[in-house]
Regions:
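Short, well-ordered, mixed-charge alpha-helical segments that flank or form enzyme active sites
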Residues: 113-116, 151-152, 162-167, 219-222, ...
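Short, conserved catalytic/metal-binding motifs centered on acidic residues
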Residues: 37-38, 51-53, 66, 101-115, ...
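Domain-level cores of phosphate- or acyl-group-handling catalytic modules
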Residues: 173-250
């Protein structure tokens, strides 16, 4: 299994992608070695803590080096996952289907639950659409690419509450020109606007699709027209609103008349 991870890293040039996303170190063990170790542990169900407790940890780096790399505020993980997804789609997936197949972007959000948020940065009370009540944690907004048979996750972001009154955890100050500042600003952006940021990142790395799929939570006229201006059509659930009119049979009609 670890050999499979190594072949995947070599085939998709993961080290170069990390470097393009500022995942670098000044000296010592290479970042790609740290990342390969982390990914290998996930697939084999191991952890650094248990390896150190049992004496089976044989890597040439310390715990502090490993966690400094994972917690670095300078690595653009959102762009990294987008670049990796684009490499997989463009070099492995697209060759398996013909040009007439319609590709899509799929956007959805889910609850990232936390039992306590008092010490979690930007931890919030967020609305769970499944249970129809507020819970502690974040909303996880995810963008995926699909050709109808294969689903490839592209990027994602954690969304805190856009209302400061619903934020439970600490709020740290960062320069908005830095990557850390931009990520925290994105986390406090409303979901329809954050969706456009994820789409723009996916398009900027060479991914493309014919349609964008999402539910009624994102189907606002502003977002639909913005997506259409990027050369894609929208397939979505209609939002129940008396203020929104839809064109049907050449006439503007409300949701209740469709």
């Amino acid at each position: 299994l670890i050999d499979c991870v190594q072949r995947f890293f070599s085939k998709h040039h993961v080290g170069k992608l990390l470097a393009r996303c500022n995942g670098m170190k000044e000296k010592g063990v290479s970042p790609v070695s740290l990342f390969r170790y982390k990914l290998s542990n996930i697939f084999v169900g191991r952890s650094m803590y248990m390896q150190q407790q049992t004496g089976s940890f044989k890597e040439a780096f310390s715990k502090n080096t490993f966690y400094r790399f994972l917690n670095s505020a300078k690595t653009n993980w959102l762009r990294f996952t987008s670049l990796l997804a684009a490499d997989i789609v463009n070099h492995d997936i697209k060759g398996l289907t013909n040009d007439s197949r319609k590709n899509v972007f799929i956007i959805d959000d889910s609850l990232f639950n936390r039992t306590s948020c008092k010490k979690t940065e930007l931890g919030s009370k967020v609305f769970d659409h499944t249970d129809m009540r507020f819970k502690k944690g974040f909303r996880m907004l995810t963008l995926s690419w699909s050709d109808g048979n294969t689903l490839i996750p592209v990027n994602s972001c954690l969304l805190a509450s856009a209302k400061t009154t619903n934020i439970i955890g600490p709020v740290k100050d960062f320069d908005n020109r830095t990557l850390a500042g931009k990520r925290r600003k994105l986390a406090q952006t409303k979901a329809p606007e954050a969706m456009m940021a994820l789409l723009d990142t996916a398009l900027s790395v060479g991914l493309n699709a014919d349609y964008v799929l999402f539910d009624s939570w994102f189907s606002n006229p502003v977002q639909i027209t913005a997506i259409h201006s990027k050369g894609m059509d929208v397939i979505a659930m209609i939002k129940k609103s008396s203020r929104i009119k839809y064109s049907y049979g050449g006439k503007p009609v409300s949701y209740t008349h469709l």
